């Protein structure tokens, strides 16, 4: 399903299911970005039609600019494993630069969107999406779990990384 980058096939510009999701994205002004194509298919089968996925492991700047044409908000909904969370973090820089509002849905371990929907149902998944924290809340929580909040060094790292994230936004 996930072909390599070639001169003919530019993964950084392809968004899986954008053709099927465009109307729903325009209507809701929001797009759910899943990590993989099977997660996107599971969302569509569950009636969540504003779901798409990037080609490759993270959303690119080109893909963020395409999504900006249709949506005001992006909800990242990547897998709960380490690779999924790292892909979400890699996507954030380009999303911040795009000017889109960003929220990050955290899927409980050991799930991905597909398995979460199968086990808990579409309504539980929609609730997870609706309650997804904003980007800065997600980042602060992530940094607090990554760095020692009981040491000055850890708190300084958190402050510096939060500052760096704020500086990447297009807001003055």
Region locations from a protein language model:
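Phosphate-handling DNA/RNA-contact segment within nucleic-acid enzymes
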Residues: 1-70, 74, 87-88
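Glycine- and other small-residue-rich loops at beta-strand/loop junctions that grip anionic moieties
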Residues: 10, 32, 52-56, 80, ...
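C-terminal or mid-to-C-terminal helical accessory/interaction module adjacent to the motor/catalytic core
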Residues: 99-172
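Short secondary-structure boundary/capping segments
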Residues: 47-51, 91-94, 120-122
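Flexible glycine/proline-rich, aromatic-decorated loop/lid segments
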Residues: 64-67, 93-95, 130-135
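Acidic, metal-coordinating catalytic cores used for nucleic-acid/nucleotide bond scission
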Residues: 38, 59, 79-88, 106-111
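Generic hydrophobic alpha-helical scaffold/packing signal
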Residues: 22, 68, 92, 114, ...
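Phosphate/diphosphate-binding loops
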Residues: 74, 82-102, 106
């Amino acid at each position: 399903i996930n072909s390599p980058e070639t001169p003919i096939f530019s993964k950084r510009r392809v968004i899986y299911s954008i053709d099927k999701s465009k109307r729903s994205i325009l209507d809701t002004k929001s797009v759910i970005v899943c990590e993989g194509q099977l997660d996107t298919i599971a969302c569509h089968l569950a009636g969540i039609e504003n779901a798409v996925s990037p080609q490759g492991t993270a959303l690119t700047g080109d893909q963020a600019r395409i999504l900006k044409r249709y949506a005001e908000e992006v909800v990242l909904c990547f897998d709960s494993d380490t690779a999924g969370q790292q892909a979400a973090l890699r996507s954030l820089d380009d999303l911040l630069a795009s000017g889109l509002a960003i929220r990050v849905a955290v899927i409980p371990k050991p799930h991905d969107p597909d398995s979460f929907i199968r086990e808990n149902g579409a309504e539980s998944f929609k609730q997870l999406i609706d309650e997804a924290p904003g980007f800065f809340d997600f980042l602060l929580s992530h940094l607090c779990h990554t760095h020692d909040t009981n040491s000055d060094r850890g708190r300084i790292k958190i402050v510096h990384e939060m500052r760096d994230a704020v500086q990447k936004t297009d807001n003055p």
